């Protein structure tokens, strides 16, 4: 099972630093080092790996087939490369529909992990306005299978530009 919070993977370094500096906490410099170490433990250490997102989408597809879910979701079929962030945000919102419709613990865990991974990578992209992109509600409603296929296509657009 992957760690749900990849940015906490390197916290052991800060723990060792704290142990090393334990005798120096009585000084002002030691306290500053301790505080900075604690702050850095909470900062993101790695970017989301889009390949994990694709693997999670394939797992969701398999799980949905086993529970025979047939909802329709707003799906971006042919997103322009300049609209990929907007399209990704729509896909992430529609994942919540799958979550609500399935009421499956395994799907819940995978969607939470996938959302966290994707959002951590999206947060590193500049906040630029994507003009001319469709709103989520303007997209065509398609089956879950088509939704997941299009979602993988959008993720691959992010892989190809990184």
Swiss-Prot record:
Disulfide bonds listed in the record: 83-133, 90-136
Pfam family, one: IL15
Sugar-bearing residue positions: 113, 121, 127
Superkingdom per UniProt: Eukaryota
The keyword tRNA-binding appears for this protein: no
One function term, GO molecular function aspect: cytokine activity
BP terms from Gene Ontology: immune response; interleukin-15-mediated signaling pathway; neutrophil activation; positive regulation of cytokine production; positive regulation of immune response; positive regulation of peptidyl-tyrosine phosphorylation; positive regulation of phagocytosis; positive regulation of T cell proliferation
Compartments (UniProt record): Secreted
Record's GO cellular component terms: extracellular space
Sorted UniProt keywords: Cytokine, Disulfide bond, Glycoprotein, Secreted, Signal
Propeptide: 30-48
Keyword Glycoprotein attached: yes
InterPro entries noted in UniProt: 4_helix_cytokine-like_core (IPR009079), IL-15 (IPR020439), IL-15/IL-21_fam (IPR003443), IL-15_mml (IPR020466)
Leader peptide range in chain numbering: 1-29
Matching SUPFAM superfamilies: 4-helical cytokines (SSF47266)
Homology family: Belongs to the IL-15/IL-21 family.
Functional summary from the UniProt entry: Cytokine that plays a major role in the development of inflammatory and protective immune responses to microbial invaders and parasites by modulating immune cells of both the innate and adaptive immune systems. Stimulates the proliferation of natural killer cells, T-cells and B-cells and promotes the secretion of several cytokines. In monocytes, induces the production of IL8 and monocyte chemotactic protein 1/CCL2, two chemokines that attract neutrophils and monocytes respectively to sites of infection.
Record-given protein name: Interleukin-15
Primary gene name: IL15
């Amino acid at each position: 099972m992957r760690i749900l919070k990849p940015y906490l993977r390197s916290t052991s370094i800060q723990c060792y630093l704290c142990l090393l500096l334990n005798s120096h906490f009585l000084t002002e410099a030691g306290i500053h080092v301790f505080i900075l170490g604690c702050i850095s433990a909470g900062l993101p250490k790695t970017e989301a790996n889009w390949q994990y997102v694709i693997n999670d989408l394939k797992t969701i597809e398999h799980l949905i087939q086993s529970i025979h879910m047939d909802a329709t979701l707003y799906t971006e079929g042919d997103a322009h490369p300049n609209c990929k962030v907007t399209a990704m945000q729509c896909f992430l919102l529609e994942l919540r529909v799958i979550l609500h419709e399935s009421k499956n613990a395994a799907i819940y865990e995978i969607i939470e992990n996938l959302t966290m991974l994707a959002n951590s990578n999206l947060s590193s992209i500049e906040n630029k306005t994507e003009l001319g992109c469709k709103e989520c509600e303007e997209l065509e409603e398609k089956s879950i299978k088509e939704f997941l296929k299009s979602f993988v296509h959008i993720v691959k657009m992010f892989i190809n530009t990184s």
